[in-house]
From Swiss-Prot:
Pathway recorded for this protein: One-carbon metabolism; tetrahydrofolate interconversion
GO MF annotation: an example: methylenetetrahydrofolate dehydrogenase (NADP+) activity
Purpose: Catalyzes the oxidation of 5,10-methylenetetrahydrofolate to 5,10-methenyltetrahydrofolate and then the hydrolysis of 5,10-methenyltetrahydrofolate to 10-formyltetrahydrofolate.
GO terms classed as biological process: L-histidine biosynthetic process; methionine biosynthetic process; purine nucleotide biosynthetic process; tetrahydrofolate interconversion
Keywords from the named record: Amino-acid biosynthesis, Histidine biosynthesis, Hydrolase, Methionine biosynthesis, Multifunctional enzyme, NADP, One-carbon metabolism, Oxidoreductase, Purine biosynthesis
Signal peptide as annotated in the record: none
E.C. number: 1.5.1.5, 3.5.4.9
Catalyzed chemical reaction(s): (6R)-5,10-methylene-5,6,7,8-tetrahydrofolate + NADP(+) = (6R)-5,10-methenyltetrahydrofolate + NADPH; (6R)-5,10-methenyltetrahydrofolate + H2O = (6R)-10-formyltetrahydrofolate + H(+)
UniProt protein name: Bifunctional protein FolD
Family: Belongs to the tetrahydrofolate dehydrogenase/cyclohydrolase family.
Gene3D superfamilies on file: Leucine Dehydrogenase, chain A, domain 1, NAD(P)-binding Rossmann-like Domain
Organism domain of life: Bacteria
Length: 281
């Protein structure tokens, strides 16, 4: 089975649009502020996509575009203003930032109650100890929704997360553990990656290396979620998993593109309306 992230993301957007209508009927107009620094073309494309998603579901979205030379103090001042603005329910700082800026300090400055990305240390800590009702990082949250839609229950299953980034790998492992999977985290120094993958019922690949996970490593009937997005020299986009060979062994697999990517954007909308609900209480 191919797990269609585009189709599931459209379903999520429909749910969000319904929730937005209910919030507006109660006098709350959800608002997301996006901060973009510099003129990185990829960042500009991502921000345009997020704005389009917000328009589709009825969330007010505004972009604060700052020059690449902006100072740390001026960027933090903008974040402080957005924190204090009652019409802003979610704040997202588009990464990466220019090298002269302290990315961690900027993310830490966002009010955790407005943290649409789920990257604030408070929210990361809440996830790790199981505090409900806090925003979850969008990509891992999207992966969990894909598993749910594919009727894959992680409970009791062996899951491997290949990659240990703060954005995907670590929170992904925490969410699978929360759902009672037995979780292994693999990374660049894992000794026998093929053997670890071969033991897993659920494989989440998020290491950022094109087709690192070979198809023959996949256990028969395993579920494969490919978070990777890598452009080859010939222009093709591929994931971290050797797709065609893995698909012959997996019971369910996400394509690249069209798998996890659309879900990341959809879960940003989910986080934003949940923050708006919390702010209205």
């Amino acid at each position: 089975m191919i797990i269609d992230g585009k189709l599931i993301a459209a379903k999520v957007r429909g749910e969000v649009a319904e929730a937005v209508r209910a919030l507006k009927a109660s006098g709350v107009a959800p608002g997301l502020s996006v901060v973009r620094v510099g003129d990185d073309p990829a960042s500009a494309i991502y921000v345009r996509g997020k704005r389009k998603d917000c328009e589709e579901v009825g969330i007010r979205s505004d972009e604060h575009h700052l020059p690449a030379t902006v100072s740390q103090a001026d960027l933090l001042a903008l974040v402080a203003r957005l924190n204090a603005d009652p019409t802003v329910h979610g704040i997202l700082v588009q990464l990466p930032l220019p090298k002269h800026l302290d990315e961690r300090a900027v993310l830490d400055a966002i009010d955790p109650r407005k943290d649409s990305d789920g990257f604030h240390p408070f929210n990361v800590g809440a996830l790790s100890i199981g505090i409900p009702g806090t925003p979850r990082p969008c990509t891992p949250a999207g992966v969990m929704r894909l598993l749910d839609e594919a009727r894959v229950d992680p409970k009791g299953k062996r899951a491997i997360v290949v990659g240990r980034s703060n954005i995907v790998g670590k929170p992904m492992a925490a969410m699978l553990l929360e759902r009672h999977a037995t979780v292994t985290i693999a990374h660049s120094r894992t000794q026998d990656l093929a053997g670890e993958v071969a033991r897993a019922d659920i494989v989440v690949a998020a290491i950022g290396k094109a087709e690192l996970i070979r198809g023959e490593w996949i256990r028969e009937g395993a579920v494969v979620i490919d978070v990777g997005m890598n452009r080859l020299d010939d222009g093709r986009l591929v994931g971290d998993v050797e797709y065609a060979a893995a698909a012959r062994r997996a019971s369910a697999i996400t394509p690249v593109p069209g798998g996890v990517g659309p879900m990341t954007r959809a879960m940003l909308l989910v986080n934003t309306i949940e923050l708006a609900r919390s702010g209205a209480r």
